[in-house]
C-alpha cells in the first residue's frame, strides 16, 4: 500500500491499527490459482486472518473453519455453508449439533477421531441426510488419527448410506521448509496408492496443508515463489490421480496486511536506542487463535 494511504488511515482510525488491502488479497489467491492450475483446489484457512473470510468466499474454493468462533464469524457474514470446510478439532457434540443444524448436508466436515465419526454417523442416520467427510491423518501429534485407525475407519464406513468419505485431510504445521512439505506429499501419495492396491479404496480428494513459509520481515529471504513452483511440480508427479486441494492461510493473507503504530517517545539507554510506541507485542503475534475464540 502507498505511504500516503497508510498515513491517511493512521490519521482517520488512529494507531495502533491493522490495515488490509483486500484487492491484494484477492490477487494473491488468483496468482496462486494461476501457479497451480485449474485442477488444484484452493482452501483459505481463515485462522490466518478471520477478517478476510468474506473476501475469500468468492476467490477460494472453500474456507477452512477451525474454532467455533470462526464458525460464528462465517455465520454472521452469511458465508454459504457449501463454501465451508468444518474442522473437527475441539468440537463437542453440542458444537457439532449447532454446526450441523446450520450447515447440514451442504458443508464438508473433517473427522478427527472415531468418536466424532460415531456422532456424525448417528446424526446423519437419524435424519437420513448424507454428509461428506474428510478423514484427518495425524502427522504424529495429537491431531487427527494414526494410519491404522484411519484405515480401520475407511473400511468400516466406506459403503455407509449416509456418510460419504470424500478423502483425506493432512496438515502438519506452518512456516515449513519446502523439502519437508514435498516429502509429506510423497508419503501421502504412497498411502493413497496403497489404499487402492491393498484395500480397493479409491478416494476422490486430498486436502493438503503445505504450510508454505512466508517472509514477514525485511531481512528474511522470500522464497515463496520458488517453493510454489516446487510444490506444483511435486503435485504433478503424484501417481495417485485424485483431486488435490491446497489449504493455505498465511500464503494467501500475509502480503495484504500492514500494521501501523506511532512512535511516542525516543531515548537511549546504555548506548542503545529505543522507540516507545503505542502498539504492543500482543498485536503482532498470531491473531487467529484469539480472534477465532472471541469473535
How should each PLM-predicted stretch be described?
Residues 178-184, 215-227, 254-265:
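Short glycine/threonine-rich loop-to-helix capping motif typified by GTGT followed
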Residues 39-205, 230, 234, 267:
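Active-site-proximal beta-alpha core segment in soluble small-molecule metabolic enzymes
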Residues 137-139, 172-176, 210-214, 250-252, ...:
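Glycine-rich beta-alpha junction loops
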Residues 4-16:
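Generic N-terminal amphipathic, Lys/Arg-enriched alpha-helix
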Residues 5, 230, 243-295:
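Charged (often Lys/Glu-rich) extended helix/loop segments that serve as interaction or gating elements
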Residues 13-22, 42-43:
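A glycine-/small-polar-enriched, mobile loop at the entrance of the PLP active site in fold-type I
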Residues 187-248:
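Acidic, glycine-rich loop-and-beta core segments that form the ion-binding/anion-interacting portion
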Amino acid at each position: 500500500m502507498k505511504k500516503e494511504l497508510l498515513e491517511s488511515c493512521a490519521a482517520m482510525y488512529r494507531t495502533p491499527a491493522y490495515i488490509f488491502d483486500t484487492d491484494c488479497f484477492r490477487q494473491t489467491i488468483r496468482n496462486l490459482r494461476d501457479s497451480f492450475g485449474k485442477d488444484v483446489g484452493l482452501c483459505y484457512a481463515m485462522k490466518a486472518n478471520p477478517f478476510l473470510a468474506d473476501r475469500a468466499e468468492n476467490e477460494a474454493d472453500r474456507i477452512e473453519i477451525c474454532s467455533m468462533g470462526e464458525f460464528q464469524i462465517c455465520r454472521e457474514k452469511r458465508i454459504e455453508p457449501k463454501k465451508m470446510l468444518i474442522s473437527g478439532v475441539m468440537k463437542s457434540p453440542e458444537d457439532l449439533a449447532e454446526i450441523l443444524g446450520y450447515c447440514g448436508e451442504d458443508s464438508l466436515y473433517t473427522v478427527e477421531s472415531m468418536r466424532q465419526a460415531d456422532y456424525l454417523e448417528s446424526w446423519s442416520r437419524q435424519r437420513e441426510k448424507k454428509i461428506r467427510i474428510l478423514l484427518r491423518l495425524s502427522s504424529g501429534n495429537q491431531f487427527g488419527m494414526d494410519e491404522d485407525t484411519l484405515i480401520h475407519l475407511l473400511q468400516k464406513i466406506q459403503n455407509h448410506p449416509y456418510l460419504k468419505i470424500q478423502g483425506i485431510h493432512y496438515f502438519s504445521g506452518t512456516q515449513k521448509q519446502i523439502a519437508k512439505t514435498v516429502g509429506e506429499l510423497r508419503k501421502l501419495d504412497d498411502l493413497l496408492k496403497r489404499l487402492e492396491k491393498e484395500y480397493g479404496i479409491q478416494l476422490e480428494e486430498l486436502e493438503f496443508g503445505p504450510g508454505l513459509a512466508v517472509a514477514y520481515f525485511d531481512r528474511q529471504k522470500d522464497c515463496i515463489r520458488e517453493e510454489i513452483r516446487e510444490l506444483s511440480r511435486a503435485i504433478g508427479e503424484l501417481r495417485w490421480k485424485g483431486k488435490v486441494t491446497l489449504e493455505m492461510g498465511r500464503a494467501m493473507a500475509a502480503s495484504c496486511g500492514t500494521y501501523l503504530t506511532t512512535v511516542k517517545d525516543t531515548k537511549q539507554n546504555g548506548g542503545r536506542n529505543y522507540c516507545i510506541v503505542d502498539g504492543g507485542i500482543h498485536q503482532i503475534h498470531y491473531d487467529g487463535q484469539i480472534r477465532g475464540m472471541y469473535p
